[in-house]
Amino acid sequence: MIKIAITKGRIQKQVTKLLENADYDVEPILNLGRELQIKTKDDLQIIFGKPNDVITFLEHGIVDIGFVGKDTLDENDFDDYYELLYLKIGQCIFALASYPDFSNKNFQRHKRIASKYPRVTKKYFAQKQEDIEIIKLEGSVELGPVVGLADAIVDIVETGNTLSANGLEVIEKISDISTRMIVNKSSFKFKKDKIIEMVERLEDAQTN
């Protein structure tokens, strides 16, 4: 049996479609009620959770495989996993965004950067050898520059429509984001053949 955790919401819907295209039994997922975990005819046991919970399940060996966004992986310090598959799901970017004149400003203090992703933000500016003040926001991060709380933001950008609607723009792309299929290293050691078979089936389903 392979135990899997899938991020709830859009990723769940898109991964379900991918599993279906790979000829896996998705009937229990499509008919999901209040069950906390389900089993399929393919000997898969699946649970659904919030992004950080998927990481926690994997970290503690509760599941073998996780489907989770690269943004969540980058923001966590868990690294005891292998990244098996780059899925064409939830594609977007991490970006530094601000007003158009941001790059030309001479700051007499540390730049204030608003973000839901302090770890990603800290790493990005550390690579640029810049000391900054990180302001953690949980809601609309774009409000940071708009209300004068921050000079710029680090956030996920998909279409850029929200940025442009508020007079902001992408200053620099940080990295590409998409859903990733990851496996606990210990699980891969003991269930390698079954896991590789699953990866190959999903790869074929992505390209067909």
UniProtKB/Swiss-Prot annotation:
CDD domains: PBP2_HisGs (cd13595). It is found in: Cytoplasm. Its EC number is 2.4.2.17. GO terms for cellular component: cytoplasm. GO terms for molecular function: ATP binding; ATP phosphoribosyltransferase activity. Pathway: Amino-acid biosynthesis; L-histidine biosynthesis; L-histidine from 5-phospho-alpha-D-ribose 1-diphosphate: step 1/9. Keywords: Amino-acid biosynthesis, ATP-binding, Cytoplasm, Glycosyltransferase, Histidine biosynthesis, Nucleotide-binding, Transferase. It catalyses: 1-(5-phospho-beta-D-ribosyl)-ATP + diphosphate = 5-phospho-alpha-D-ribose 1-diphosphate + ATP. It is an enzyme of class 2 (transferase). Pfam families: HisG. The keyword Glycoprotein does not apply. Catalyzes the condensation of ATP and 5-phosphoribose 1-diphosphate to form N'-(5'-phosphoribosyl)-ATP (PR-ATP). Has a crucial role in the pathway because the rate of histidine biosynthesis seems to be controlled primarily by regulation of HisG enzymatic activity. Heterooctamer composed of four HisG and four HisZ subunits. Lacks the C-terminal regulatory region which is replaced by HisZ. Belongs to the ATP phosphoribosyltransferase family. Short subfamily. PANTHER family: ATP PHOSPHORIBOSYLTRANSFERASE (PTHR21403:SF8), ATP PHOSPHORIBOSYLTRANSFERASE ATP-PRTASE (PTHR21403). The stability and homogeneity of the HisG-HisZ complex is apparently increased by ATP and 5-phosphoribose 1-diphosphate but decreased in the presence of the regulatory inhibitor histidine. This is ATP phosphoribosyltransferase. It comes from Lactococcus lactis subsp. lactis (strain IL1403) (Streptococcus lactis).
